Regions:
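Juxtamembrane loop-helix boundary motifs flanking transmembrane segments in multi-pass membrane proteins
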Residues: 1, 48, 62, 66, ...
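Helix-terminus/capping and membrane-interface signal
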Residues: 1, 12-30, 102, 106, ...
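Alpha-helical transmembrane segments of integral membrane proteins
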Residues: 2-3, 100-101, 105, 109-133, ...
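Transmembrane-helix boundary motif in ABC transporter permease subunits
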Residues: 2-4, 24, 28, 86, ...
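N-terminal signal-anchor/signal peptide hydrophobic helix marking the start
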Residues: 6-12
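Hydrophobic alpha-helical transmembrane segments of membrane transport/permease proteins
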Residues: 15-71, 160-208
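An internal, D/E-rich "acidic patch" concept
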Residues: 60-119
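Residue-level signal for discrete positions within transmembrane alpha-helices
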Residues: 99, 103, 139-142, 146
């Protein structure tokens, strides 16, 4: 096993080199001016016309031979410079850093129902083999396998935010809404009195003693957590049920 893993690890640099080289050559088929657009984050930077464009092409090395550009890209990659993200309007590293806390928070809260519910319902389903609860959980796992995540997310948003919350606004105020916080909570978090210790809103709200903000953040996490965890929960439940049936 160790020898197999070692061989695979030896091939990893070759695979990475080949994959990045192919993608780089594909991008090279674009016009240099089209590739230059990735380096421009403000149209005012191009007021100089074609002369300014040519100057920027030389500045970023886009007129160099492809192998020189690739070597420069690898050198920047090795130094931690992953380039500019047009989507994030910042460096790639900056975009990752800005979005990582929200991603980590969502992953942490999604992990709990995946493990807890899958183990509990897997055991319950196996103990009640071919009974109603077993058939119900099997239907849930089939739905979890077959339903795309983006479809589930849109359906939950339509049902709970579009119907339930709008029908009972006083009962579900701040729940099921898109985003990470309500407007009032976002203003409080952006204030100078609120200290961002970790970037995780639930943790930071608790550390700041802002329990209303914590409750609001949890209410906004419900639908994303269900959407993210359902497919993994269904897969783990199925494995747990099969293992328990073999044991019993």
């Amino acid at each position: 096993m160790l020898a197999y893993i070692g061989r695979r690890l030896m091939f990893l640099p070759v695979i990475l080199l080949g994959a990045t080289l192919i993608l780089f050559l594909m991008v090279q088929q674009l016009d240099p001016y089209a590739r230059l657009a990735l380096y421009v984050n403000d149209p005012a930077q191009l007021k100089g016309g074609k002369a300014e464009l040519d100057r920027r092409l030389d500045k970023h090395g886009l007129n160099d031979p492809w192998y020189a550009q690739y070597a420069g890209w690898v050198a920047k990659l090795a130094s931690g410079n992953l380039g500019w993200s047009e989507t994030a309007k910042s460096t790639v590293v900056g975009g990752f850093a800005a979005r990582f806390p929200a991603t980590a928070e969502l992953a942490l809260f999604a992990f709990l129902p995946i493990v807890a519910l899958a183990i509990w319902l897997g055991v319950l389903s196996a103990v009640n083999h071919n009974k109603f609860i077993d058939q119900l959980t099997r239907m849930a796992t089939i739905l979890g396998y077959s339903l795309p995540t983006f479809v589930l997310g849109l359906a939950l948003l339509l049902l709970f935010y579009g119907v339930v919350r709008q029908s009972l606004p006083a009962l579900f105020d701040g729940w099921f809404s898109p985003g990470r916080l309500s407007t009032w909570a976002q203003q409080l978090v952006n204030g100078q009195a609120f200290v961002r210790y970790t970037g995780l809103l639930t943790v930071d709200a608790a550390l700041n003693g802002q329990w209303r903000v914590l409750w609001d953040a949890l209410g906004h996490l419900i639908l994303p957590v269900v959407t993210l965890s359902y497919g993994s929960w269904a897969a783990m439940l199925r494995v747990m049920r099969s293992s328990m049936l073999e044991t019993l």
